[in-house]
Amino acid sequence: MSHRPSVQFLRDYIAIPSVNPMGRDDIPADVAGERRYAEHVREQLRGLSLDAELVGDPERPSIVAEASVAGATDTLLVASHLDTVPVDTMEIDPFDPVIEDGRLYGRGSCDTK
């Protein structure tokens, strides 16, 4: 099924696990941490000609990106987070986003992904 580019963009983000381990050792390694998701976002930002780097904890990095606009006098700061809460209680596959009755379901779909 074909979706609008913005919906597919969000589906691609949801499909990348970025679970905050919250100090727990029972979170599977393939979903714990934000590194894969941060790398994906960084590459998308670079594709938009922004300078983007990962900083901080290698497994739970932050992204710092900067765009210079000729003649601009104002600064815009966008602050968000990359992690999601654990998926223990989800009844659907949290990283296989589905659309049902016009709503998108998946971990992070109603947060900052």
Predicted segments — roles?
Residues S2-C110:
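Acidic/His- and Gly-rich active-site-bordering loop/insert found
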